[in-house]
A protein has these predicted regions:
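Residues forming the flavin
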Residues: 1-16, 20-336
Length: 336
């Protein structure tokens, strides 16, 4: 469904994620946000943990409670309603023109039709750097052992997390949205495309750990044009759909095959969690441009030096990961 999926709907893409509540900014409103989420049903521990997280299972109820609270306060939520003809003073929703004092667009990183409309209407939209890659899955017990050693499995520690990065020249390879005890989920929002993302439940008690392993893409890689940025993502997603068999299975390649330039090795020890293992062997070098493959290979080898076993040859890599951030930037005025 192109209008209701993991990218669009109640809570947006964040509903199906690890539910991390972290930010790099230091703002007094952070505690206000945490307190509000707590009042709406988030667990008590988000108020005191250094790295709080909610988890998709609980977050779905939190979003439901938020909807009810917005309605109670006089707000109106219209689902399955497309916003068009957007100006600074009005918007058309399902054919109804709604005048307003201000329009706030919070459309996330995947509203490609909205981006295209804004560009066509003359709004200032520019191409920006983003990232593409794959989802790497390891046994959570292997990550725990590599990170905690003899203390792996201690309930007071919880499952181990990681965040890895490596640079070569002006390009980087890094892990993103690491989900301890989580699963890889299908996140396409257009027909004929395959996209991966990761999510965890609050308990983080799944067998696998997963994280996106992504390579930075610069505007000059795709023509420094906002529409070209969207098309770069879309082409990768279409190639993934074809490589997966055109039935929304995801393409998968083992880490060992990716490093050595081979393909066809089936998964064994680690079962990919994407739709319960609905993956097919593929050759990612036929999906990604050479600069992405070069950085993925080098980055994964480097990560194996930081976490023992990270670059194990039987690690399944599922793709494609294209929605880590928006490929375009809508320019704000000086008053914002």
């Amino acid at each position: 469904d192109t209008s209701t999926n993991i990218q669009f709907g109640a809570g947006g893409a964040g509903t199906f994620s690890d539910g991390k509540l972290t930010t790099r900014i230091n703002d007094p409103l952070i505690m206000y946000v945490l307190d509000m989420l707590h009042q709406l049903g988030a667990p008590d521990d988000i108020m005191y943990k250094a790295k709080p997280h909610i988890g998709t299972d609980i977050l779905r109820k939190v979003v439901e409670n938020a909807d009810k609270e917005i309605t109670r306060l006089g707000g109106e939520i219209r689902y399955k309603s497309k916003a068009e003809n957007i100006t600074s003073s009005s918007v058309t929703v399902n054919g109804e023109r709604i005048p307003c004092g201000a329009v706030i667009l919070a459309c996330g990183h995947s509203a490609r039709d909205t981006y295209s409309e804004l560009i066509g209407a003359g709004f200032s939209v520019e191409a920006k750097p983003f990232s593409v890659g794959v989802r790497a899955e390891h046994l959570q017990s292997d990550i725990d052992t590599a990170m905690y050693g003899a203390h792996a499995g201690d309930s007071q520690l919880g499952h181990a997390e990681y965040q890895l990065s490596w640079r070569q020249g002006d390009r980087g390879c890094y892990t993103f949205c690491m989900c301890p005890g989580g699963e890889v989920v299908p996140s396409a929002s257009e027909e004929g495309g395959v996209v991966t993302n990761g999510m965890s439940r609050h308990a983080r008690d799944g067998k696998n750990a997963n994280a996106a392993v992504c390579v930075s893409v610069k505007p000059e890689d795709y023509g420094n044009n906002p529409l070209s940025a969207i098309e770069f993502q879309r082409n990768l997603e279409k190639r993934a759909f074809l490589a997966g068999g055109e039935d929304y299975y995801a393409p998968m390649q083992t880490l060992g095959d990716l490093i050595s330039g081979k393909s066809g090795t089936e998964y064994k020890r680690i079962v990919p969690s994407y739709r319960g293992g609905k993956v097919r062997c593929a050759d990612f070098s036929k999906l990604f441009p050479p600069f992405v493959m070069e950085m993925l290979r080098a980055g994964l080898v480097n990560f194996g030096k930081k976490i023992k076993g990270y670059d194990a040859p039987d690690v399944p890599l599922t793709g494609v990961e294209t929605r880590t951030s928006s490929p375009v930037r809508i320019i704000r005025g000086e008053n914002l």
